[in-house]
C-alpha cells in the first residue's frame, strides 16, 4: 500500500540526486551528533552519582527522577507537533511565531503541573514507591523546578532541527555536559542527594540559556518575546485535540 501511494504521488524515481543525498546525510549526521550529546548529558549524572553517592542515595535519586519525569510528557507532545509546523514555514518570522505559540502553550501545562506536583509529591512517592522512599521528596521537588528550562531547551532544539541548524544544538549540548560535570563535582560533596538534584536543574538551565543566546545572535529571536502570552496561544490545544481524535479514529 505504501509503495502504491508513493508511486501515485510521483515521489518514486530511479534517478538519484547527489545534492539531495549529501544534504540528507549531512543533516542526519549533525542531528545524530546532537542526539548523542543530549543522551550523554542525560545519563552522565547517574554515571557520576553511581560513584559519588552511596547506593541508598542513588536509589532515592532515581526514584526522584522517575516520579517527576511524566511532568514533561506534554513537552514531548508539543515537540512532535512543533517540528512539522516550523518546517512548513518559509520565512524566519513565521518560524519564530509558531515557536512562540507552542512554547507558551507548553508552559500553560508545565507550570500548573509543576505546582501541583510539588504539593502532592510526598503522597505520590509514598503511594507509588512506599514510605521508605519519602526521603526522595525534596530531590523530586527540586528536579521539577527544571520544567521551564527543560521546555525552553526542547522547543529551541526543535526549532533548530526544523530549521536545519543543528550546529547550535550540538554546541549547547556540549556546554551541558561540561556544566553537568562541574555542577556535580561542586554540589554533590556539599549537599549530597539535594546537590545532585540542584546540579540537574543547573545542567538544564545554563545550556538552555546558552542556546537562546546563540539563536538570538544568529536569527534575532527575542527570548523575552517567547514569554509574552497571547490569546491565540490557546488555539494550540485545539490542534492537540484534533490530533488525538485522529489517533483514536486510527
What are these regions (language model features)?
Residues 1, 126, 140, 164-167, ...:
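Membrane-interface helix-loop junctions in multi-pass transport and translocation proteins
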Residues 1-42, 81, 88-97, 219-249:
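Interhelical loop/hinge segments that connect adjacent transmembrane helices in multipass membrane
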Residues 25, 87, 94-120, 137-140:
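Interfacial transmembrane-helix starts/ends
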Residues 30, 45-47, 59-75, 104, ...:
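Alpha-helical transmembrane segments of polytopic membrane transporters and translocases
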Residues 52-55, 89, 162-163, 190:
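Helix-loop interface residues and adjacent transmembrane-helix termini in multi-pass membrane transporters
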Residues 55, 100, 118-148, 194, ...:
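Interfacial segments at transmembrane-helix termini and the short loops linking adjacent helices
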Residues 68-93, 157-162:
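Helix-loop junctions and terminal segments of transmembrane helices
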Residues 144-174:
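Membrane-interface junctions at transmembrane-helix termini in multi-pass inner-membrane proteins
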Amino acid at each position: 500500500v505504501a509503495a502504491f501511494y508513493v508511486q501515485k504521488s510521483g515521489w518514486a524515481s530511479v534517478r538519484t540526486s547527489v545534492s539531495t543525498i549529501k544534504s540528507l546525510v549531512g543533516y542526519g549526521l549533525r542531528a545524530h551528533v546532537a542526539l548523542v550529546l543530549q543522551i550523554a548529558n542525560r545519563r552522565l549524572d547517574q554515571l557520576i552519582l553511581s560513584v559519588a553517592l552511596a547506593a541508598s542515595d542513588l536509589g532515592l535519586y532515581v526514584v526522584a527522577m522517575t516520579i517527576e519525569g511524566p511532568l514533561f510528557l506534554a513537552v514531548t507532545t508539543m515537540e512532535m507537533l512543533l517540528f512539522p509546523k516550523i518546517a512548513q514555514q518559509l520565512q524566519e518570522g513565521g518560524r519564530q511565531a509558531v515557536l512562540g505559540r507552542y512554547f507558551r502553550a507548553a508552559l500553560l501545562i508545565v507550570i500548573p503541573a509543576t505546582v501541583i506536583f510539588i504539593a502532592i509529591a510526598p503522597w505520590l512517592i509514598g503511594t507509588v514507591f512506599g514510605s521508605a522512599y519519602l526521603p526522595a521528596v525534596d530531590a523530586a521537588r527540586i528536579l521539577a523546578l527544571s520544567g521551564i528550562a527543560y521546555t525552553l531547551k526542547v522547543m529551541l532544539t526543535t526549532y533548530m532541527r526544523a530549521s536545519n541548524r543543528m550546529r547550535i544544538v550540538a554546541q549547547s549540548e556540549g556546554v551541558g555536559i561540561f556544566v553537568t560535570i562541574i555542577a556535580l563535582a561542586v554540589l554533590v560533596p556539599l549537599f549530597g542527594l539535594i546537590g545532585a538534584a540542584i546540579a540537574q536543574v543547573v545542567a538544564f538551565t545554563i545550556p538552555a540559556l546558552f542556546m537562546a543566546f546563540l539563536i538570538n545572535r544568529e536569527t534575532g529571536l527575542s527570548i523575552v518575546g517567547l514569554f509574552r502570552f497571547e490569546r491565540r496561544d490557546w488555539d494550540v490545544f485545539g490542534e492537540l485535540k484534533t490530533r488525538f481524535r485522529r489517533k483514536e479514529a486510527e
